[in-house]
Amino acid sequence: MQPWREQMLFVRGMYKSTFRVPSFNDLYYDRLGSRTLRPEKADEYDIGITWSKSLFPAMDYLSLTVDGYINNVRDKIVAFPSTYVWRMANYGKVRINGLDVTLATAFSLPYDMNISMSAAYTFQKAIDLTDPTSKSYKDQLPYTPVHSGNAALTFKTPYVTVGYSLVGVGKRYYLAQNIPVNEIAGYVEQNLTLSREFQFRNVNFAIRGELINIADKQYDVIKYYPMPGRSWRVVANVKF
């Protein structure tokens, strides 16, 4: 639905009922799979808006998207950490309430240059409602942050493209109970890229340099598996 065409405002709503059969790996992967897995079923509700407009001539666009959703999931299939290895398991009943917000814009500059920027934020409360007598009842699911987001900035010239990106993830829990001893700290990772594309005769070249984790942040995505510190890489592509 588009109630105000001149403002480029779209409103949408959705309901769907989904059914997911466990994959072959979910069932039989060595030490990880579980042959007792039940199919995952969910009722999903979503409502959202998208607004887009150019506020002045140099601005190509300004876009804002907001989506809110509620998912009621039965027998949710998850990878569940155990003492020595991970196992696939069903959560009997899970409710997921979430909000996604995305903002993006771009500007045209003189001399064939442009700048684009984007940012996204996700709020997701995914709680276990399986057993009211369990110590993890109404606790956040393992490895599911309540808050996460990212941002990116790209400056493009006829000669080179410079990019900066940032990813932020809030605290998580690596076991079912949301207690301090099970907490994994949140983190922010920043990356920088420099790239150039050019053509020589009929051959296209692309060279890209990346500086990853600029701040040399030490963090875990999975408990006890630390991610690398600051690193760099160079990638070259040739197309004939």
State where each predicted segment sits:
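Membrane-embedded beta-barrel scaffold of Gram-negative outer-membrane proteins
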Residues: Q2, V11-M14, R20, E40-L99, ...
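Residues on the lipid-exposed face of transmembrane beta-strands in outer-membrane beta-barrel proteins
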Residues: M1-Q2, I47-W51, V101-T105, A119, ...
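Residues that define the transmembrane beta-barrel architecture of outer-membrane proteins
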Residues: K41-Y45, I70, R95-L99, Y143-G149, ...
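Flexible, solvent-exposed coil segments and beta strand-coil junctions
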Residues: P22-L32, I77-V85, D128-S134, V169-A176, ...
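Gram-negative outer-membrane beta-barrel transporters
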Residues: P57-N72, A89-Y174, N202-N204, A215
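A generic beta-sheet turn/junction motif
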Residues: W4-E6, S17, F155-Y159, F198-N202, ...
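Extracellular loop and loop/strand-boundary signature of outer-membrane beta-barrel proteins
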Residues: D30-L37, Y84-Y91, T133-Q140, Q177-N182, ...
